[in-house]
Swiss-Prot record:
Entries under PANTHER family matching the protein: TRIGGER FACTOR CHAPERONE AND PEPTIDYL-PROLYL CIS/TRANS ISOMERASE, TRIGGER FACTOR-LIKE PROTEIN TIG, CHLOROPLASTIC
Keyword line: Cell cycle, Cell division, Chaperone, Cytoplasm, Isomerase, Rotamase
Function text: Involved in protein export. Acts as a chaperone by maintaining the newly synthesized protein in an open conformation. Functions as a peptidyl-prolyl cis-trans isomerase.
Name of protein: Trigger factor
Gene3D superfamilies assigned to the protein according to its UniProt record, in alphabetical order: 3.10.50.40, Trigger factor ribosome-binding domain, Trigger factor, C-terminal domain
GO molecular function term, any single one: peptidyl-prolyl cis-trans isomerase activity
SUPFAM superfamilies given in the database record: FKBP-like, Triger factor/SurA peptide-binding domain-like, Trigger factor ribosome-binding domain
Amino acid sequence: MSTVIENLGKLDRKVTLAVPKAEVEQEKQSRLARLSKTVKMSGFRPGKVPMKMVEKQYGQQVEMEVRFDKAARQFFDITNEQGVKVAGQPRFELKSEGVADDQFAFDATFEVYPEVKIGDLAGAELTRTKTEITDAEIDKTIDILRKQRVHYHPRGEAGDHGDGGEAVAQNGDRVTVDFVGTIDGVEFAGGKAEGFGFVLGEGRMLPEFEQATLGLKQGESKVFPLAFPADYHGKDVAGKTAEFTVTLKQVEWAHLPEINGAFAQSLGIADGSLDKMRADIRENLEREVKRRTHALLKDQVMDALLKVAELDVPKSLIEQDQERLVEMARRDLEARGMPNVKNMPIPAEMFAQQAERRVKLGLVLAEVVKVNALEAKPEQIKAEIEEFAKSYEDPKEVIRWYYGDQQRLAEMEAYVLENNVVNFVCDKAKVADKAMSFEELTATQGAQG
């Protein structure tokens, strides 16, 4: 049989393989002999099953395995000898016509990696975001940290934690209510609750509901109409008007911690220094700015590379990546607590576009790295790990954690190499700086998902 690799198209190839039947039979008998030592059958002790019975039970299955194993081994020997870079997995089809009596023949069809051409990057226009952390941003962060440590105390009570006034619901208060809603006098699903709590002003409830609750005294009730929006998530009530009765059972005011030494210590500042606290917050925000601005620039660089790149993308690699994305989605759903995820059908087609971009980008990046001899230097990897470790309580332990596992180290090496590609493209392209506030930066990142 010829071992000439046939060209079927841009990336598609075919090679015909011949496997001697004698070799298959010899390997089949060898595997059955090994299997007979452990196989279990009713009426026989393990290892004492007659060979004829083992062959009758497992012979056909073992023979098929041997055929394809030998075909696969021959396939990879041929492609390696001829320097062919196989993309994805080959598909083997057993031939039935034009085959010698003493052979099994297979047609192996497969794809090869494409030639990748990277065009001129000089015309690419990129924007490098510049964001400065101001004292106002630090103050906002401190406010957020205070709200995360809020304590609620009953309104209308005296004492250290009482406000001494009336128990009247105000904006920012945490309220506990009973409510019941009806449409045309009939209660509806989800329209009734007892002991339901929420914070006024956070927007968790519809505006009309919050407005009706504001100003209520503890123990007081109110009847009011509420028009559900047409796009409301509850389809049974969307676009309809309900009548609600709400009763205020409890109202609590928010007590935010004071900005003092104790507050600073709660944030990990051992000596309670407010200056150190602010410096620490600034450092964390600047680290976040660096991460976000780099992500924005990296996205632009990847888009620029895809625009100037010319290549055909192997379908087999796209299909493999679709399956990876399906499994990633399944693990994500499991992590979120969704039941029966293993049996849930997740169509791979929904990831087709994403998978094609990922595969194409991977091929383009590999070509840029190879042609321009880019590499992740040990000192770059070390610096990146140390920078990452700074955000943890025990940086030295994080550094040991990275260097203690080759897989984690390889992931960091890939990250550094990708950064080097970004820097390489920026050196070739036209890059303009653009000022952006921290609020705008976080909003931009949020919009991108």
